[in-house]
Amino acid sequence: MAFKNPETIGLHGGEYRSDPTTTSVAVPIYQTTSYQFKNADTAANLFGLKEFGNIYTRIMNPTCDVLEKRVAALEGGLAAVAVGSGQAASAFCVQNVCQAGDNIVSSTDLYGGTVNLFKNTLSMQGIEVRFADPKDPKNFEKLTDEKTRAYYGESCPNPYLRVFPIKEVADIGKKHGIPLIIDNTAAPVICKPLEHGAAVVMHSLTKYILSLIHI
């Protein structure tokens, strides 16, 4: 069943209805690190990615699986991956499309921690970040070359809250085969970046979604 109301998605999204053992409707917190395999063939298939299932908590955890599916449902996406922090999510998005020698074009309106990540950490990995003023979406195109692998922006930037022109920048990206990554931390309910052309959406979940309650 596909829910439409964001409150309902938050409570019941992600294909979870009840715990198969206790029938509890609350999602259990699985604290285990390891899982028992039915037999050697099952283990081989799981590690060979021929079957979907739990291997090791650092890779897959049933509690995280529900979280990932609910966030994906909230955004109208296909799937999601939960990582340790919002900054890890930003880095993960960029590092999955870039290698040393590549570049991305980012909005100048960014959370300070992301600016630090882009200017310092990624540069040490050989990834160049070019900054474009989003007031004119064409600025992204001006900084694009054959090594540009992604565009990056925040839907409602912290702290400026100047709304990012998602559709306009996404359209430019599609013309050049470049995906747009949107940090939707500030507006996960009122803004749906995927509907406006973004390819990837990320969140720092401890902010709007969890109201500063840590997972």
Spans of features found by a protein language model:
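Conserved PLP-anchoring active-site segment centered on the Schiff-base-forming lysine
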Residues: 96-114
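Short, small-residue-enriched loops and turns at beta-alpha junctions
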Residues: 111-112, 137, 156-161, 187-190, ...
